[in-house]
Regions:
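Hydrophobic anchor residue at the start of the ABC signature
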Residues: 146-147, 174
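Conserved catalytic loops of ABC-family nucleotide-binding domains
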Residues: 177-189
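Conserved ABC ATPase signature
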Residues: 108, 132-136, 140
Length: 189
């Protein structure tokens, strides 16, 4: 079953076509790597799938990607797209991945906090939970953003440049973790 189907999708910014006439299908168990040069449209493709940029052509998300109004899509942005000055702890960053499910006015439960700490521990950064996000290293931030993307148990996980700012050891761990996650979600990176 396809979670995402794109037919003849194009996205333009101020007259410049960032992506042109893309046809793509993402199945429910796919592990898809999108490659290309800097400025080649990879992030624009991701933003089209997420619905954050206008596009032409047909882009269909399967009903399985929705629970009521909630989208079951986890997203890890490029680290450069994240505001390091925002006054929030690493733990709060991870918990913010639940906002699509809970809404902005809901409080996090004890179980939510335990799950977030479990993900931070699995990422090897539980000791940074109370640290301001702007004070952790780039690699630690990447780990926190990955935990944020998976805390809501998405059906589709989209990662934009996930291996930037991480050391070789964590990069291997990252791919091993993604392989395990791919047993119950599609992954695009």
């Amino acid at each position: 079953m396809n979670l995402v189907t794109m037919r003849d999708v194009s996205v333009a910014y101020d007259g410049y076509e960032a992506i042109q006439h893309v046809d793509l299908e993402i199945g429910d168990d796919d592990f898809l790597g999108v490659i290309g040069p800097n400025g080649g449209g990879k992030t624009t493709l991701v933003k089209a799938i997420l619905g954050t940029v206008p596009h032409t052509g047909e882009l269909t998300l399967a009903p399985e990607l929705f629970r009521g109004k909630e989208r079951l899509i986890g997203y890890m942005p490029q680290i450069s797209d994240f505001d390091r000055a925002f006054p929030i702890s690493v733990l709060e960053v991870v918990l913010s991945g639940l906002q699509g499910r809970r809404g902005f006015s809901s409080r996090y439960t004890k179980e939510d906090r335990a799950r977030a700490m479990e993900l931070l521990a699995a990422s090897g950064i539980a000791d940074t939970a109370r640290s301001p996000i702007g004070e952790v290293s780039g690699g630690q931030m990447q780990r926190a953003l990955l935990a944020r993307a998976v805390i809501s148990d998405p059906k589709l996980l989209i990662l934009d440049e996930p291996a930037n700012f991480v050391d070789n050891k964590f990069e291997k761990e990252l791919y091993r973790t993604l392989h395990e996650l791919n047993t119950h979600m599609a992954i695009v990176m």
